[in-house]
Design a protein with these regions (language model features):
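Hydrophobic alpha-helical segments
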Residues: 1-192
Length: 192
């Protein structure tokens, strides 16, 4: 039985989307072999789609003091805490690929404190989780602690921004009933 991409809102046909959005979806499909459901679901509101992915790309694709794998660690840990099925599965796949580690995303999703990560990465995730769950409790001590692990002010901004951005993404995925593409489940688990 084929399940809907998202349970609660219609998914527009690709051929009916604005040219720029259709082009982006087809580019993603060409690169990965499928269109991730987040693209199709958010295309329901084209202006918001554009804003969402512009901010996503600014956070997740630029050069910074965080590796692309570390950014995905933040997404997986905070999405797990927010019980976002879509983001844990989709970004877990991306993390496995970027870290070249088939076990890391499962470890982080279940309990990042027991994952095979460095003390620096654990400090990063501790800060990210606090931003995600208790941002109102962030104190100067938190900034001192994370700086002690070699994170710059720009790195700390990135950790906070990724945590905050994916809180939005997690909530929209849950509200829309977005389901992960089947392709994500096996990505990065077996050597090519």
């Amino acid at each position: 039985m084929t399940q809907p991409i998202a349970k609660r809102f219609p998914t527009p046909p690709i051929d009916k989307l604005p040219d720029d959005i259709r082009s982006r979806l087809l580019g993603v499909q060409e690169k990965s072999g499928f269109v991730p459901n987040v693209f199709l679901t958010l295309a329901y509101r084209p202006d918001e789609f554009r804003a969402f992915f512009a901010y996503h790309d600014a956070l997740m694709e630029r050069d910074s003091g965080l590796t692309k794998a570390e950014r995905e660690m933040i997404v997986v840990a905070t999405s797990s805490a927010n019980q976002c099925h879509y983001c844990v599965i989709a970004h877990g796949a991306i993390l496995r690929i970027r870290a070249k580690n088939p076990q890391i995303s499962d470890q982080i999703a279940v309990n990042y404190r027991k994952a095979d990560i460095t003390p620096r990465q654990r400090a990063m995730l501790d800060f990210a989780m606090k931003v995600s769950a208790e941002a109102h409790k962030i104190s100067e001590q938190d900034f001192t602690d994370i700086a002690g692990h070699g994170f710059s002010d720009d790195d700390v901004w990135d950790i906070a921004a990724i945590s905050a951005f994916f809180a939005l993404s997690n909530r929209m995925a849950n509200v829309t009933g977005m389901r992960p593409n089947d392709e994500f489940y096996m990505m990065g688990r077996l050597p090519k």
